[in-house]
Each structure stands twice: as C-alpha cells, then as structure tokens.
Amino acid sequence: MEELQEYFKKDRSPQQHFLYPLLLQEYIYTLAHDDSLNGSIFYEPIEFIGYDNKFSLVLVKRLIIRMYQQNFLIYLVNDSNQNRFGGHSNYFYSHFFYSQMVSKGFSVIVEIPFSLRLVSSSEEKEIPKSQNLGSIHSIFPFLEDKLSHLNNVSDILIPHPIHFEILVQILQCWIQDVPSLHLLRFFLHKYQNLNKTIQSNKTIYVFSKENKRLFWFLHNSYVSECEFLLVFFHKQSCYLRSTSSGAFLERSHFYGKMEHIIIVCCNNFQKTLWPVKDPLIHYVRYQGKAILASRGTHLLMKKWRYYFVNFWQYYFHFWSQPYRMHINSLLNYSFYFMGYLLGVLINPYAVKNQMLENSFLIDTVINKFDTIIPIIPLIGSLSKAKFCTFSGHPISKPIWADLLDFDIIDRFGRICRNLSHYHSGSSKKQSLYRIKYILRLSCARTLARKHKSTVRALLQRLGSGLLEEFFTEEEQVLSFFFPKTTLFTLHGSHRERIWSLDIIRINDLVNN
C-alpha cells in the first residue's frame, strides 16, 4: 500500500490554487452558455422556468455584483433549495436561475486544471490528433483484433452511487482552492436535500438532469481514480514498462524477474521488434461499464478481481460487491457492451493437405469475433418510448399525431437511420430488420390515426415513398460499391460489418 500511495503522489500534476476568483469573470459564463465552444454535444440545454433560455450579459453582470456581497452564494444555494417547491414567485425564479448560472460557470472552472493536464500530456507523448479517435465505434475494431485471441473476460460494473464527499476528496488531490471545494459541497448538498423532497433514490438522477456538465466531470474524475489502479498493477506485473495508452514507448528496456533467474537483455532484440505482440491484459471502458480481458488463466482473473475489490474498499472507503465483476470464458459467454452482445465464435475448418501421393485432411479451428444486436433490450426500449407493445407489436404514437405528415415520417425515419447506422457493425442483421419493421408500421399506424384511416388505405395512397425514408445511407453506399450482392435484403448477406467513425454517443434507445 505504501508503494501504491507513492505512485499516486508521483502521478499528480501541480495543484491549482486560484480558481474561485474566476467566478467573477464574465467570459466564464459565456463559455458555459456556448456549448459549441467546448464540444458539449452530450449536454442538452436547460430550460429555466419563467425565463427565456437566451444568454444575457445583463444578468451575468447582475449576478457578479451580487456575488461580491457577503455570503451571497450560501444564501443562493439554500434559498433555491428551500423555495423550489414553495410556490412560483419571481423570487424563486431569480434565485433558481442564478443558481443554475453559477453551477454551469463552476463546471467550466473546475475543468480547467484537467484540460491543461490533458493537453500537456498529449503534447509530451506526441499523440496525433484525429477526429476518428473520438468515435465510440473505434473501440470495436480494437476488440475485433484482440478479443478472438484471449481466453477470459471480466465484465465490470464500476461501483455507484458513492457518497458525494468522496467526489470532493478526489478533486482535493488536484485542486487546493478551498473556496471552490466548499462551493462544490454546497451544490452537492443542494441536490442531496432536493433528493429528500422527491425520492430517496433519485439523487444522482436529479443531479445529472440539472447539471450534466458537472455530473459527467465528477463521474469521469471518479472513474479516472479507479483506473489508476489498473495502470499501477499493470506496470508492476509486466516485463515491459508500458503506458496507459497501450503503446510500448520503452520497448528496448526490459526487466528480469530475479526469483525465476530470468534476465532478458535488450541487446538480444532489435528496437523495432516486438517480443511480446499483445499485452497480458486488455482494458476497455465506456461510462460505468468496463471489460478486462486476458490470455491468462481463470485464477489470474480472480486475482485481478481481488485487487479491484480491496482497492475500492481501501481507497474509497466503501464496500464493493464482488458480484459486480463477472469472470467468464470468452468461448462460452456473450456480454452486453455499448448496445451489442459481444462474444467469440468457434468456426471449425477442414484443410486438405497433399504431400506427393498422399493427401489428408487437417481439422483446424478459427476463433471469430461476433457482434449481435440484442433484440429484446431494443424492443423493450421501443416499448418504453410507446412505439410498440412489450411483445414487439407495433402501435401508433398518439403524441405525434398532431404533427405534419412530413414531420411524422421524418422523425420515424431519423430514429430508424440512427439505429441502423449505429448497429451497422453487427454480423447478423436479421434483428435489425425487425426493428425497422416495428418503426415502419408504427409510423403507418400514426399517420392512419391522424387521417382516421386504415394502414392498408394509407399505404396504397402513399406508395413506396414511406419506405424510402427508412432507407439508410449505408445501404445506398454498399449497393454502389457491391452491386452484385444485395447486402441489406432479407435474402442477401448479413455478415458485413461496418464501423462508423462519426458516432460520438449512443442513441437513447440503445442505451436503455
């Protein structure tokens, strides 16, 4: 544990001491309002009650003047919390609005130390900037290349929710600005008290809805602390000193294990040669779920689970259930990750070998990475969104029946195209056809409900124009490059995988 503590101290960047005065600067609130400057595509705009959602410098200046008053921020948080459900007065509107402004501005400020650290580390490692690396689909080619050669996989659920004070202590290691940390405690205390007014198990939900930027920042800070353990143990257990990005920057330096009397000299290998093609451990995470895969034995994976559970208990001071980490063999197990069911298929092949006059057959096995669309969770998501029943029977969408015909078709078509675009990497697309069928028929039933007609009469009147809205761009491109095969028809091939490098978030229907 002492070695672990030294590792944590060594890896810390210089702490920031003067963040709190930035709350008195107007440009901070301009940055917080303009999400496009920060690439905040994940954050939906918040609609303030009783106010137009437009940015106003007058309100910002008024807020800054009031913040110069003594204990204004304390009263702001407390009054906003007490009056949220106490009536719709102008006093409540103004305090709630100011509280939201300060909260969003504070979110921008606390990101500054981490942004500087990220930029400096990328410049030191000379990591090339590429927009394609921002796509979450870029994870799947890595899994496709590595997963078929591994033996065991551990499906990890990162522990949540945790106490808010633990989040403050995590930031305290990076930020030593005491007023900023106290202000963060006030905001977290506000949502905790608001939780008591609504329900006892909705704290994280309310917090993430009202201030997504701050919520995801705290969440990523917490997950970053969890991943420090993985990097530490990986450096302690490997021959090569590797980095968290997986690149062997010091590939010419080797270390021998003296207990086995094995000393590997760097002179025996060329610097461009990779003596170990694959690391022992592969780690992939998205949001609160992670995958730890290894070529090692089942006992090795149990040791890693033991390390994780004990680390969470020691460092974060809370009990972590071992059942959050499932260890299974990749050949007999499929796990749900990022909207796909991932697994490894065993494909037997018979190879004919002929030597002079003798010929014989050699049976061989090839492991293949398999991606399946989970049809049951998708139908459940469509059912929650009122597109079908729990059994998958399409129904109309009454809430959209008052829209124009073009808007109704466009909304259904956009959902269908997004789902098809995201699941283009599936090796079996039969399930995707059922989802398309549900959305098409739900669209037709919605239009028939609006015009007080039947689906048959509506389709006869509209013709094939209704179906063209559900024809995805991938199908058009593939039909151009592969004219001899109908890839996306029911009688064609269904196993072509396409990983799109422009997807930066999971569709809400997929993520349910």
Curated annotation (Swiss-Prot):
Q: Which domain of life is it from?
A: Eukaryota
Q: What is this protein called?
A: Maturase K
Q: Which InterPro entries match?
A: Domain_X, Maturase_MatK, Maturase_MatK_N
- HAMAP family linked: MatK
Q: Where in the cell is it found?
A: Plastid, Chloroplast
Give the gene name.
matK
| GO BP annotation list | mRNA processing; RNA splicing; tRNA processing
Instruction: Print the keywords alphabetically.
Output: Chloroplast, mRNA processing, Plastid, RNA-binding, tRNA processing
Any one Gene Ontology MF annotation carried by this entry is:
RNA binding
Chief localization? plastid
Provide the Gene Ontology terms for cellular component. Answer: chloroplast
Name the job this protein performs: Usually encoded in the trnK tRNA gene intron. Probably assists in splicing its own and other chloroplast group II introns.
Source organism per entry reads Lilium henryi
Recorded family membership? Belongs to the intron maturase 2 family. MatK subfamily.
